[in-house]
Amino acid sequence: MKLKFISMAVFSALTLGVATNASAVTTVNGGTVHFKGEVVDAACAVNTNSANQTVLLGQVRSAKLANDGEKSSPVGFSIELNDCSSATAGHASIIFAGNVIATHNDVLSLQNSAAGSATNVGIQILDHTGTAVQFDGVTASTQFTLTDGTNKIPFQAVYYATGKSTPGIANADATFKVQYQ
């Protein structure tokens, strides 16, 4: 019986070594993980989702944008500020920058790089008072009063006709900075 037990133990040890070698570890290159961010000395930190957001304006009939100054229905969006200290700054304003239509310095021009882009229309952003923002990279929006913690600064975007619009893709980009006072 002892001999049978010893034989089984030796056999188990030998087969365990073979099984281990059969499932050898393989390592391959996987890729790169990029980390992006910024440490700021400011009253608040811009929320990651606000730093690179897309506002969906949807489809608007060109008949609704037939004359200079006509607007689509507004679509709300916000710039969220986190970890705010009202003791550091009591107010925040947003400074937008972007390419504008020559005759309308408060209307973003569309990215007309693709065939089939809309014409005679741009995008206007309104601040929380309904005032159109400038896109010169210098002029700040109306001040927003900060509270401690999280703050959402509300805006609205509209399509803005600069003449009789024609249908097509109507996309634009703007960058922003936050000014604390």
UniProtKB/Swiss-Prot annotation:
Signal peptide: 1-24
Paired cysteines (S-S): C44-C84
Gene3D superfamilies on file: Fimbrial-type adhesion domain
Main subcellular location: other
Compartmental location: Fimbrium
UniProt keyword annotations, A-Z: Disulfide bond, Fimbrium, Signal
Disruption phenotype: Deletion leads to loss of fimbriation and a decrease of hemagglutination.
Keyword Nuclease: no
Top-level taxonomic group: Bacteria
Gene Ontology annotations for the cellular component aspect, listed alphabetically: pilus
Disulfide bond keyword on record: yes
GO term, biological process aspect, one: cell adhesion involved in single-species biofilm formation
Further comment: This protein belongs to the group of SfA (S-fimbrial adhesins), which are associated with uropathogenic strains and with strains causing newborn meningitis.
PANTHER family linked: FIMBRIAL SUBUNIT ELFA-RELATED, FIMBRIN-LIKE PROTEIN FIMI-RELATED
Function: Fimbriae (also called pili), polar filaments radiating from the surface of the bacterium to a length of 0.5-1.5 micrometers and numbering 100-300 per cell, enable bacteria to colonize the epithelium of specific host organs. The major fimbrial subunit. Interacts with alpha-sialic acid-(2-3)-beta-Gal containing receptors. It belongs to the group of Mrh (Mannose-resistant hemagglutination) fimbrial proteins.
Family: Belongs to the fimbrial protein family.
Protein name: S-fimbrial protein subunit SfaA
Species per Swiss-Prot/TrEMBL record: Escherichia coli O6:K15:H31 (strain 536 / UPEC)
Upper taxonomic lineage: Bacteria, Pseudomonadati, Pseudomonadota, Gammaproteobacteria, Enterobacterales
Recorded name of the encoding gene: sfaA
